[in-house]
C-alpha cells in the first residue's frame, strides 16, 4: 500500500502549495539524512517500520530532521487534519524527483577510517524491505573505495508482501535464516534489518 499512500500524500501536499522532493523508495534513515542535507522544512517516510504487511503509515520529521511526536507537533497536525479547513491555495506545489542515495553512501563511507586486512564476509538480510537497494549502492561505494567487504544477500529484493515473514529481526523466530546463513557461508557476521531499515540486529 506504500505507493498508493505516497501518491495520495503528494497530491495532498502539492494541492496545499507544498513543493515535494520525491526520493523514491528509501529507508527511514535516508529520509532523515536528506531532510537535513537538503535543508528541507520536513520529511515524511511512508512506512509501517517492523510491522506486518497490512499495516502502514507515516513517520514525520521537521527541520534538521527532528522527530515529530505527540509532545512536539503531532497532536497539532492531528487537530488540523480533523478540522479539515484549509485556506485556498495560491499555487500548486511542484514535484521534484531527486536521488539522494549517492550523498548518503558517501556520508557512510566517511565513517570508515581504516581498511580490513582481509575481506570481511557479511550476511545481509534486507527482510524484503527497502534495505536491499540501499545495500547494493553501499556495496558499489565500498568497492570504489577499495574496502574489502563481501555481502551475502538473503531476502534481498523489496516485496511488500514479506514472503519470508514480518521484517522484524527483534523477534526470535525471524533470526533463524540469518543465523543459518552466517554458519553456512562461514561469514564474519550477519546483519538483519526491519522493513524501513531504521533498526537492525547483529549476529
Regions found by a protein language model. Name each.
Residues 1-55, 138-202:
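N-terminal small/polar loop signature for handling phosphorylated ligands or for N-terminal nucleophile
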Residues 56-185:
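Gly/Ser/Thr-enriched, mixed-charge loops and adjacent short helices
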Amino acid at each position: 500500500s506504500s505507493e498508493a499512500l505516497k501518491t495520495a500524500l503528494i497530491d495532498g501536499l502539492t494541492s496545499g502549495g507544498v513543493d515535494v522532493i520525491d526520493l523514491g523508495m528509501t529507508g527511514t534513515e535516508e529520509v532523515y539524512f536528506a531532510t537535513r542535507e537538503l535543508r528541507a522544512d520536513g520529511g515524511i517516510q511512508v512506512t509501517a517500520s517492523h510491522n506486518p504487511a497490512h499495516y502502514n503509515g507515516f513517520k514525520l520529521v521537521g527541520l534538521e530532521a527532528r522527530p515529530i511526536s505527540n509532545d512536539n507537533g503531532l497532536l497539532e497536525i492531528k487537530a488540523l487534519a480533523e478540522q479539515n479547513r484549509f485556506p485556498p491555495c495560491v499555487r500548486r506545489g511542484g514535484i521534484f524527483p531527486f536521488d539522494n542515495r549517492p550523498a548518503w553512501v558517501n556520508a557512510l563511507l566517511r565513517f570508515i577510517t581504516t581498511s580490513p586486512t582481509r575481506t570481511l564476509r557479511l550476511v545481509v538480510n534486507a527482510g524484503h524491505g527497502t534495505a536491499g537497494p540501499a545495500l547494493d549502492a553501499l556495496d558499489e561505494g565500498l568497492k570504489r573505495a577499495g574496502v574489502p567487504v563481501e555481502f551475502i544477500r538473503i531476502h534481498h529484493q523489496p516485496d511488500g508482501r514479506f514472503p519470508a515473514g514480518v521484517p522484524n529481526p527483534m523477534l526470535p523466530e525471524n533470526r533463524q535464516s540469518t543465523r543459518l546463513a552466517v554458519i553456512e557461508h562461514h561469514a564474519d557476521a550477519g546483519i538483519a534489518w526491519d522493513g524501513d531499515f531504521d533498526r537492525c540486529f547483529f549476529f
